């Protein structure tokens, strides 16, 4: 199995309007303290970007096309699913490979924007830059506690047949999240 690296950021409140709140553990000589940090669309506008990893760009593109109409919480949830897949052996081991899996066949991909037969354009540059900052922040190892370990999701507007084989974990924004149900062997 792949090693999963989790930093000290932990979401503590998934919905504060258009924001997500995190507790950050700070180590000091007196022990560890928890500081609360809240990220919203507005606060993301003020973050600066340096050189961006190509994997972060793939993550941002997927968030943009799959969840740009969602608030920060919904966008984070989609990012979490993609990163959860990267950590699982049954999926490709990079963000770019995860989001492009099956893209060569019409309607056979994992992320519909990649194989719906329509060209994709980033028309809202302000939203894309904000999403790129969000992707950069979460790619660096933020703990993924929002979706209950989900590796699948779909819009509430559809009812795909593949959901019957999965365990529903959460509904966030306009998406429903699922994970592969663990099976326990009986002796």
Where on the chain are the PLM-derived regions?
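Bacterial extracytoplasmic/cell-wall-associated proteins, especially those involved in peptidoglycan
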Residues: 1-187
